[in-house]
Amino acid sequence: MIISAKFITSLVVKFDENLSSNFSEVAFLGRSNVGKSSLINSLCKQKNLAKSSATPGKTQLINFFEVTCKRNEEKFNINFIDLPGFGYAKVSKNLKEIWNQNLDEFLKFRTSIKLFIHLIDSRHTHLEIDVNLNDYLKRFLRPDQKILKVFTKCDKLNQSEKARLKNEFKDSILVSNLNKFGLDSLEDVIINQTLGFDK
């Protein structure tokens, strides 16, 4: 379980090999307004740990959080990485190209990332931007890395819709920040996969 978390730093979107981590890391990715910051806050049980911008795509920062977990009375540290949302409408084309290139370098060369959490709005499960993101991650995924699909805002679905979604995406997790649905399951998967306890 996650017992504490703290903000470490914010970085402009670019790869810097000097900014390495001693901890295994979890990267949260998804399109703008999918609920990345809210999910991090819910998992860490802190309302304002990760702050979301009122204007999607306005912030070009990668935010790092040090998270302390406990498993069988033993404590471990991992980092959560809150990445800028994909698919911003209010960013110039040139800035978007630079942004995407820098994110590309960061994701490919950040070897401490062990788990990519791809957040998808449960009401819009087959958007082209999400299909492309999934394909993109698979192209450079290393043997020690995994992708986990997490469907957000599941409080908007009825039971049959949830069952249908879970049946289609069998290894995914459905969550709701509003009623805390699925958060315990997600927390367990994050800890086990990031620290290698699932092997």
UniProtKB/Swiss-Prot annotation:
Domain EngB-type G: residue ranges: 22-196
Xref: InterPro entries: G_ENGB_dom, GTP-bd, GTP-bd_ribosome_bio_YsxC, P-loop_NTPase, Small_GTP-bd
Keyword tags: Cell cycle, Cell division, GTP-binding, Magnesium, Metal-binding, Nucleotide-binding, Septation
Domain of life assignment: Bacteria
Any matching Pfam family: MMR_HSR1
Any Gene Ontology CC annotation: cytosol
Keyword Magnesium among UniProt keywords: yes
Binding positions (GTP): 30-37, 57-61, 82-85, 152-155, 175-177
Secretion signal, residue range per the UniProt entry: none
Sequence positions that bind Mg(2+): S37, T59
Cofactor: Mg(2+)
Molecular function per GO: GTP binding; metal ion binding
Listed GO biological process terms: division septum assembly
HAMAP family registered for this protein in UniProt: GTPase_EngB
Family that this chain belongs to: Belongs to the TRAFAC class TrmE-Era-EngA-EngB-Septin-like GTPase superfamily. EngB GTPase family.
NCBIfam families, per database record: GTPase_YsxC (TIGR03598), small_GTP (TIGR00231)
Protein name: Probable GTP-binding protein EngB
Organism name: Campylobacter jejuni subsp. doylei (strain ATCC BAA-1458 / RM4099 / 269.97)
